[in-house]
């Protein structure tokens, strides 16, 4: 639909950007922090660094927050490292961890930047993983106790909470994050059992938040991608419906309505993946109500009908070589109408508008975008300049689509792209940069870790100062 005039961004719109603890903080074993599954990895993709130092945000957070304030951030979305708060995942609290995040929150508030806190962003305590991780129901209780500690210590200053970052990616690609035993006979059944436990843990955390912090707001943060059928063939359309139900709506239907959607359940039943559901689980899931939906969007996906020959589940290119098919259910396909970036990701700003509309139409909850950005091989040029016009173009095109979606009637209250500052990519090290701020280091040479404003820094600063009006 076209409009004569687009809606303006509201005055209280939360412009900001995002990071995660293990990708930006460093200080992996300092001040009492315990090891996470990320720290326990014994190998990394060839030519990429580990996460031990990262961007050294732990020691430089004041400098970083000052730069965020200079950009004009209204909000900053970051994650808390579970093992910095409770080193063993359950049990004793680490005072130094409480102190660090308390200081970070205070520093943000000093500049009138709203903290948006992700409670769990891939970095499960390794002590819990060694006991079975999310496969064990005991982690539900451990997560609830961890949540209570966060609410007790930071709830007086944090209004916005995100439960679990990209739970659907942890399930769809479980072997990539160190939370799945690759030797299991039926690893996908185990993943969907882990998923059920995470969903119950999330529901308990949402209920606890509303009980302890009645003025706070909490919601899930999945990765959502619009799914196109590869053609107008009815079989391709059904395949796209299947992919949508399994990849996207399974997680949000559970978070919002406390029920497994029929397509996802039929898929799990057919494949032998249905989880064990204990008495009381569904009541807990139905009782929990998010206040908003946060979601991450980078690209859309395309699906075609299964070929029925066992070849559906195959890597479809891109830098992460993630599998995007399910035998007999759908098959991942390229979209010939979209351009790709250097890492093989299809760029689809209009699909972002459609995604916003579809989520809002389905759930009627306010939306905030908590990741959206462009990874690239940024080059530091003479006079400390980084001319990342490609990032400006990507972010600009996506923000324009937020404005279109708002004119469509979608309630969007914030935008926090990935990432505020260069950090370590989960799969591609520090060479794949996302930030508005350049961190002067290489994969294996820390150099001086100096912070350098990219061209996109100044562009985003102007955009925020105009509350989006400079788009036009």
Question: Model features per residue range: what roles?
Answer:
Residues 2-45, 69, 88-90, 98-472:
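Active-site region of glycoside hydrolase catalytic domains
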Residues 46-59, 134-137:
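Active-site mouth loops of central-metabolism enzymes
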Residues 57-66, 87, 97:
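Internal amphipathic alpha-helical repeat/solenoid segments
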Residues 60-81, 288-292:
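Catalytic domains of carbohydrate-active enzymes, especially glycoside hydrolases
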Residues 80-93:
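Glycine-rich, proline-tolerant flexible connector loops at the mouths of alpha/beta enzymes
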């Amino acid at each position: 639909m076209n409009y004569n005039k687009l809606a303006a961004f509201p005055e209280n719109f939360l412009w900001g950007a995002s990071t995660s603890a293990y990708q930006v903080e460093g200080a992996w074993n300092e001040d009492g922090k315990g090891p996470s599954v990320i720290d326990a990895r014994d190998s990394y993709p060839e030519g990429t660094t580990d996460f031990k130092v990262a961007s050294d945000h732990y020691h430089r957070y004041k400098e970083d927050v000052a730069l965020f304030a200079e950009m004009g951030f209204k909000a900053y979305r970051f994650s808390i490292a579970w093992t910095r708060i409770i080193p063993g995942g359950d049990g004793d609290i680490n005072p130094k961890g409480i102190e660090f995040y308390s200081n970070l929150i205070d520093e943000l508030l000093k500049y009138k930047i709203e903290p948006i806190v992700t409670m769990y962003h891939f970095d499960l305590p390794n002590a819990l993983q060694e006991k079975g991780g999310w496969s064990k129901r005991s982690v539900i209780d451990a997560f609830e106790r961890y949540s209570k500690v966060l609410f007790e210590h930071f709830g007086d200053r944090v209004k916005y909470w995100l439960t679990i970052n990209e739970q659907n990616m942890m399930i769809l690609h479980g072997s990539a994050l160190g939370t799945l035993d690759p030797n299991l006979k039926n690893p996908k059944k185990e993943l969907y059992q882990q998923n059920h436990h995470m969903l119950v843990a999330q529901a308990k955390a949402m209920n606890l938040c509303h009980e302890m912090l009645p003025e706070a707001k909490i919601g899930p943060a999945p990765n959502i991608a619009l799914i196109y059928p590869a053609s107008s063939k009815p079989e391709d359309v059904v395949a796209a419906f299947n992919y949508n139900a399994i990849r996207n709506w399974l997680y949000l239907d559970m978070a919002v309505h406390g029920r497994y959607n029929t397509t996802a359940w039929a898929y799990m039943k057919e494949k032998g993946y249905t989880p064990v559901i204990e008495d009381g689980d569904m009541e807990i899931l139905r009782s929990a109500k998010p206040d908003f939906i946060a979601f991450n969007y980078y690209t859309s996906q395309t699906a075609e009908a299964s070929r029925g020959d066992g070849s559906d589940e195959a890597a479809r290119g891109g830098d992460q070589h993630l599998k995007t098919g399910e035998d007999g259910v759908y098959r991942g396909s390229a979209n010939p109408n979209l351009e790709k970036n250097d890492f093989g990701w299809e760029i689809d700003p209009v699909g972002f508008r459609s995604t916003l509309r579809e989520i809002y139409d389905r759930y009627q909850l306010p939306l905030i975008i908590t990741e959206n950005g462009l990874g690239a091989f940024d080059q530091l040029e003479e006079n400390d300049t980084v001319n990342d016009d490609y990032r400006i173009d990507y972010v600009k095109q996506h923000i324009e689509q937020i404005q279109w979606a708002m004119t469509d009637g979608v309630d969007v209250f914030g935008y926090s792209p990935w990432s505020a500052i260069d950090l370590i990519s989960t799969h591609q090290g520090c060479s794949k940069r996302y930030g508005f701020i350049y961190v002067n280091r290489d994969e294996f040479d820390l150099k001086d870790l100096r912070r350098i404003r990219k061209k996109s820094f100044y562009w985003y600063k102007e955009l925020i100062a105009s509350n989006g009006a400079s788009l036009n």
